[in-house]
Amino acid sequence: MKMRLQNEILSDIDQFEPSPEGDWRGLDALLTELWQTTKVNEACLPVLFRVFERFPDDSSAGVCWGIVHGIESTDLDYEKPLRESLARRSSELGQIMLHRLEKWTASAQ
């Protein structure tokens, strides 16, 4: 199987829609592909946060938590793009990430 470029995976994530039955496995597979085959960098953040904006109430049956855990496992400084995303459209998981980030920052001082 040919490894796809990061921008191809991100494009598919950006265009993802769950099935009418509420099947999110396609996004789960795309996130797995992104985390396992590419070096996630700052350029990925807007696309990943747009998923939160498109589905602000997280009806993903836990799939979008993969974005939270994936980003939090990197050493990326994601606070600014997260705040920009929340300014465009508040989302449940975006708010959770911001709260966790602020809590971690406060405890690290």
Whereabouts are the PLM-identified features?
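HEAT-repeat alpha-solenoid elements in large eukaryotic scaffold proteins
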Residues: 18-29, 44, 53-57
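Amphipathic alpha-helical scaffolding segments comprising HEAT/armadillo-like alpha-solenoid repeats
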Residues: 2-13, 40-53, 76-86, 107-109
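Structural detector for internal amphipathic alpha-helices that build alpha-solenoid repeat scaffolds
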Residues: 25-39, 62-73, 95-107
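Structural detector for tandem alpha-solenoid helical repeats, activating at a conserved register
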Residues: 43, 62, 77, 92-93
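Alpha-helical interaction scaffolds
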Residues: 14-15, 78, 89-108
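Alpha-solenoid helical repeat architecture
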Residues: 17, 52-56, 71, 86, ...
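Solvent-exposed, amphipathic alpha-helical segments
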Residues: 8-19, 30-33
